[in-house]
């Protein structure tokens, strides 16, 4: 899963990609091609 600042280009990678809001975060999910998954701006673990 990629961590991106903006999901605008991520949702246009594949026609099946869709944006979902879960627990206050925005995710891009793609059931037909799971390598296109992305999340918007998550805090990095240290």
Swiss-Prot record:
Cellular component per GO, a single term: ribonucleoprotein complex
Induction: Expressed during stationary phase in minimal glucose medium, induced by EDTA, strongly repressed on shifting from minimal glucose to minimal glycerol medium (at protein level). Induced under zinc-limiting conditions in stationary phase; repressed by the zinc uptake regulatory protein Zur.
Domain of life: Bacteria
A molecular-function term among this protein's GO annotations: structural constituent of ribosome
SUPFAM superfamilies linked to this entry: Ribosomal protein L36 (SSF57840)
Biological process annotations from GO: translation
InterPro entries: Ribosomal_bL36, Ribosomal_bL36_sp, Ribosomal_L36_bact
Entry keywords, A to Z: Ribonucleoprotein, Ribosomal protein, Stress response
Classification via Pfam families: Ribosomal_L36
Family: Belongs to the bacterial ribosomal protein bL36 family.
Record-linked PANTHER family: 50S RIBOSOMAL PROTEIN L36 2, LARGE RIBOSOMAL SUBUNIT PROTEIN BL36B
Protein name in UniProt: Large ribosomal subunit protein bL36B
Organism: Escherichia coli (strain K12)
């Amino acid at each position: 899963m990629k961590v991106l600042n903006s999901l605008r280009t991520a949702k246009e990678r594949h026609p099946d990609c869709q944006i979902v809001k879960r627990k206050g975060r925005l995710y891009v999910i793609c059931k037909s091609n799971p390598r296109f998954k992305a999340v918007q701006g998550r805090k990095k673990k240290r």
